[in-house]
Amino acid sequence: MSAKTEEILESLKSLSLLEASELVKQIEEAFGVSAAASAGVVMAAPGAAGGDADGGAAEEKTEFDVVLESFDAAAKIKVLKVVRNATGLGLGDAKALVESAPKTVKEGIAKADAESLKKEIEEAGGKVTLK
């Protein structure tokens, strides 16, 4: 790699996501290309090679919202305890959140944390979706 390309690469590494997004838009306008078209081709190739077993990279989100859809009336207290522990809300606020289902319990959390919270709520008697 030439010194010039290494310098450009190092500059790109220091960009924030917002700056990188703006840069992509400027490159698209300057060169009359579309990054979305080339990204689609790149994303399709691994999916085709893998046999589409797991749905591909379309589900590769990094942040998830945990939404309490409903709960078993008999398990309300158990669900309330899990929600309260997960959110740090007081008893009244957690109760209001649970009773107003469907309602978002936590927003923008990592996939592993979201799946763990989903499992906890479901074990307590709630129905949860990840968005």
Curated annotation (Swiss-Prot):
GO terms for biological process: translation. Transmembrane segments: none annotated. Keywords: Ribonucleoprotein, Ribosomal protein. GO terms for molecular function: mRNA binding; structural constituent of ribosome. It comes from the Bacteria. Pfam families: Ribosomal_L12 (PF00542), Ribosomal_L12_N (PF16320). Gene3D superfamilies: 3.30.1390.10, Single helix bin. One of its GO terms (cellular component) is cytosolic large ribosomal subunit. SUPFAM superfamilies: ClpS-like, Ribosomal protein L7/12, oligomerisation (N-terminal) domain. Forms part of the ribosomal stalk which helps the ribosome interact with GTP-bound translation factors. Is thus essential for accurate translation. Homodimer. Part of the ribosomal stalk of the 50S ribosomal subunit. Forms a multimeric L10(L12)X complex, where L10 forms an elongated spine to which 2 to 4 L12 dimers bind in a sequential fashion. Binds GTP-bound translation factors. PANTHER family: 39S RIBOSOMAL PROTEIN L12, LARGE RIBOSOMAL SUBUNIT PROTEIN BL12M. Belongs to the bacterial ribosomal protein bL12 family. This is Large ribosomal subunit protein bL12.
